[in-house]
């Protein structure tokens, strides 16, 4: 199993893999689900290298895993854009910078966001934690939509069209941005010839 790197003070279980690659005598590699970890020898508050054990489905004797705990020098802020009335989607993982100038990731637990903060155009910050003493900040920009790019596509009778995953959105301050879109289309929409209007829903927020 590859070495696992965890930031000092970060919850270990959130960063451990869920599967392990098992190499059989015939050369076949197959993934097995990890069922448990024994972390008694691990101290996430003290930088260093630790050896822990785990168990996996189909592996009678268990396995060993090397975990390196590194000192964290900085947690990178996150920039997110959303549209009015849509709760911003904050990332599960954030980037951390270690003292040895390498980078890694950690799971962030974000504070709840009151609806009034994204009810109108503006900006606000959200605080998240990646450990008892480590915080991360998300800078959220809320924009009001002025217009959305109209899409026109052709398809064959009975064949679902290839629709774009994003569209250009123009905001009230005259800026534009590509935003993800979810199309509300079914097979019934392409069962007869002619022009059909398909509704798309903006996905709401982007991490930049």
Q: Which residue ranges define each predicted feature?
A:
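Solvent-exposed, low-complexity, repeat-rich "mucin-like" stalks and linkers
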Residues: 1-29, 71-103, 144-176
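Serine/threonine-rich, repeat-prone extracellular segments and beta-strand-based repeat modules
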Residues: 26-66, 101-141, 173-208
């Amino acid at each position: 199993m590859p070495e696992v790197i965890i930031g000092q003070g970060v919850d270990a279980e959130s960063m451990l893999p869920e599967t392990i690659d098992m190499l059989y005598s015939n050369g076949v590699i197959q993934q097995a689900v990890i069922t448990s970890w024994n972390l008694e020898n691990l101290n996430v508050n003290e930088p260093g290298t630790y050896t822990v054990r785990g168990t996996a489905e189909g592996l009678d004797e268990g396995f060993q895993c090397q975990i390196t705990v590194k000192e964290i020098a900085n947690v990178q802020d996150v920039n997110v854009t959303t549209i009015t009335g849509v709760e911003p989607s904050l990332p599960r993982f954030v980037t951390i910078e270690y003292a040895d100038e390498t980078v890694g990731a950690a799971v962030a637990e974000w504070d709840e966001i009151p609806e009034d903060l994204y009810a109108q155009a503006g900006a606000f910050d959200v605080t998240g934690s990646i450990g008892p003493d480590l915080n991360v900040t998300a800078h959220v920009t809320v924009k009001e939509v002025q217009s959305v790019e109209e899409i026109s596509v052709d398809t064959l009778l009975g064949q679902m069209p290839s629709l774009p995953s994003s569209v250009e959105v123009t905001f009230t301050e005259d800026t534009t941005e590509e935003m993800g879109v979810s199309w509300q289309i079914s097979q019934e929409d392409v069962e007869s010839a002619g022009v059909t209007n398909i509704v798309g829903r903006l996905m709401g927020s982007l991490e930049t």
